[in-house]
Amino acid sequence: MTVGQALERAEELRPGSRISLRTRQQWLRELDGLLRLRFFARCDTKEFDHAGADRAWAEGLQDQDRLLVPEPFDGLYVHYLCARTDAALGETDRYAGEQAQYNGICAELAGWLRRSYPVRRAAQWRW
């Protein structure tokens, strides 16, 4: 999924949310940095080294920049953006639902990474 696709899908679900584009881009950067640290850094592969909003941020995040998480788990970006939007606007019930969906996809992603890639030496999975 690209930055533009994630932002567009989240905007469809939360139209007119009053959250600036720059803030939503910052959320994507923070999320990719967190996911890289918690999940992808433990995998002994270089496949994901150049993807992610955290890596593209220095050059200015563009709509066509590829996000870190591959299909079919990339739907987590939309749930994350919606959850952050709901939290920022005080929509706690909507936030809880979106966050639960995000957490479920994260758990599936962690399992897939453990099964698909060897663990780097001196790294431990804690999920």
What are these regions (language model features)?
Residues H79, A100-N103:
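A generic structural signal for well-ordered alpha-helical surface patches
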Residues L35-R38, R84-L89:
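Generic structural signal for hydrophobic core residues of well-folded globular domains
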